């Protein structure tokens, strides 16, 4: 069973995807970590003449071990590096193939990202699109950062999320455009336990419907 979980920044999709993976005993891939892992692999070569070639090679050699680098993957620096390698077409293609291979392993998987149900796995068995209003998403991200000891400017963080939302709206395959057959789940007023219960119920309903003769 392949479960695709999409949504905008800080919508809770990653936490929900991890919970679904535990519940259904499936492997989980946070696709947002992929470009960060590639960026970190070539961080000592930024600005070098062969930077793009090194990034392409790193993307093609990426394996699960690169996604266990701990908190370094979630730092702002890793985010900057991710943006530098994400503009390379060959890196993007390697990342798409990595995600498809992960999804289609025996037994399936849960993947969360921004275009899983539309671009990566249009054949997913269950597609969830997680949304929440921007204020709720900003507050969640602020609490997440504060839990790591990071000082947060909430107004600036909210502005950043609104800016990213605006960019996403300009991309027809981006995080604001769910697959036509995706199930929408608004988590604005839900805590993680309630959101996970709702997501599990959606998956169970889809599976039950498919099981009917």
Question: What residue ranges belong to the model's regions?
Answer:
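Hydrophobic positions on the alpha1 helix immediately C-terminal to the Walker A/P-loop
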Residues: 16
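Phosphate-binding beta-loop-alpha motif at adenosine-nucleotide cofactor sites
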Residues: 126, 131, 176-192
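P-loop (Walker A) phosphate-binding loop of NTP-binding proteins
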Residues: 8
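C-terminal alpha-helix
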Residues: 198-209
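Hydrophobic anchor at the beta1->P-loop junction of P-loop NTPases
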Residues: 3-5
